[in-house]
A protein has these predicted regions:
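Tandem CBS (Bateman) regulatory domains
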Residues: 1-9, 50-82, 86-95, 116-155
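Glycine-/small-residue-rich active-site loops that bind phosphorylated ligands and cofactors
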Residues: 12, 42-43, 62, 79, ...
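The conserved cystathionine-beta-synthase
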Residues: 13-31, 38, 81-98, 104-106, ...
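A glycine-centered beta-loop-beta connector
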Residues: 27-29, 35-53, 94, 102-118
Length: 155
């Protein structure tokens, strides 16, 4: 099965010059915790921001969310996948990078969607596919492993 069959294409995004307060409002209003960051120049994905990233950046910099640009908190080490990749490849990337969501990007780096572990779980539940359920469980187990200080620094 291809990532394109499970990914969500209606994705909220932001650019790196927006303020964390604006992105926090977007997350609150749409009940999301992950936003791809898009370059205003090229339209390519240049990072991702999570609710956790924003909170920790504001806390440790001693500033309000409205004082900080997204670029001060976004992750630039982007784990992504292509729409034509097999779901197993996406699961492997999620496991390796210990993430629940992946931007789905075209060859030019532009966002075409997002695929999440929840998408895999919903698919497994709909189809009652034991092999797929096992793959999802293994991926979740890998994602949930505690990070070492070294892997946290790489993220």
């Amino acid at each position: 099965m291809k990532v394109s069959e499970l990914m969500v294409t209606d994705v909220f995004t932001c650019n790196d010059t927006e303020l964390l307060g604006d992105v926090a409002r977007l997350m609150w209003e749409h009940d999301i915790g992950f936003v791809p960051v898009i370059s205003s120049e090229s339209g390519a994905v240049v990072g991702v921001i999570t609710d956790r990233d924003g909170f920790l950046a504001a806390y440790f910099q001693g500033k309000m969310l409205w004082e900080l640009p997204v670029r001060s908190a976004m992750s630039t080490r982007i784990a992504s996948v292509s729409a034509d990749a097999e779901v197993g490849e996406a699961e492997s990337i999620m496991s390796e990078f210990q993430v629940h969501r992946l931007p789905v990007v075209a060859k030019d780096g532009k966002l075409v969607g997002v695929v999440s572990l929840n998408d895999f779980a919903r698919k497994a539940a709909r189809e009652a596919n034991e092999k797929f359920e096992e793959e999802v469980a293994v991926t979740l187990g890998a994602i949930c492993q505690p990070r070492t200080p070294e892997t946290r620094a790489e993220a």
